[in-house]
Amino acid sequence: MKDINRDEVVRYSNAPFFDNVPENRTRIVVDGRCVCWNATEFALKAYPEVSNVEERYATILWAFFDRLKRTAQRFRTNKFIFAWEGKTNLRKSLYPNYKGNRVPKPTTSEFLTKKRQERKEHRELIDSLAPFWLTIQNEIIPQLGFTNSFSFEGYEGDDIIAMICKNAGNTPIAILSDDSDMYQLISDSVCCVSAMVKSNTVRGRIPSVLDRQKFMKHFKLKPEQWSEFKAVRGCPSDNVPGVLGVGAKYTTLYLNGEPMLKKNGKPITAKLNIELAYKDGTIDLYRKLVKLPFEGTPNVELGLDDFSMEKFLKMCNKYHLSYMIEDEFWADVFGGK
């Protein structure tokens, strides 16, 4: 398997532990919904002139596999595991507003109103294409011979990824996702890789990597503290409110046991609010919502992939992906080289 430019890797996505892992040793765990979302968004922005539905599906599929390719080249592996959302979510039984839609505050600003409308229309367009993600999950991935693709009713893809990491031992894991919930899974042998490709620059071509060292330097916390951070601070994307009036700064100070005092020596209001939330059980509830994996998540049994060039060619011809047929990387993967 060909490497991408190693100088570029060191500059933009260095992760010392993973750079020394033998070829095909690292497993790439794919957050299926996240990568599908990013692939769809990229396809819409990169090819705005495409209006035919089949052509849009083709660009989404290309962008999806392009992200797999970039990550595989970065970690010199063809070992993929896919995790997908279940149709229902058990967390809603604990907290009905989990992942609920938040109502934006009223505004008289024409600019803000216009931006909100543009975001709404963009979201509706992505949602209209989302059914194709199920085609990727239920048809394309298994038909290509990827054996390790999982979805469990009531659980999120995040939970499946957490179980995989939990049972991986010392096997190197690269999580392909932009969901910050995954940060709590980072360890000496687990890193997170961004699925976003924002431009055609060098930096855009190489996936950015967040390992344990980088996480601690940036967030001033250990990855093991991240779920507690989200329980206290809140998780807007999942509609978990957190403690009222407490932001990232005070949450970090509290979790690190640093002073949170006024000039007169009395505790600041944020600290009092956090302590009250621990006492009344609020944090216990929020922790159950944000900590991975969710209680009861099934174990994952991994198998061997069943790749063949015949399956790959059939998929490429069906979705008009002739350029993938000519790609040496995919020829290596599905040709068994």
Locations of regions flagged by a protein language model:
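Long, highly charged, low-complexity intrinsically disordered interaction regions
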Residues: 153, 164-165, 175-242, 253
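Long, highly charged low-complexity segments enriched in Glu/Asp and Lys/Arg with interspersed Ser/Thr
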Residues: 313-337
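Amphipathic alpha-helical/coiled-coil segments positioned at domain termini
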Residues: 309-311
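Accessory alpha-helical DNA-binding modules that contact the DNA backbone or grooves
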Residues: 222-300, 321-325, 331
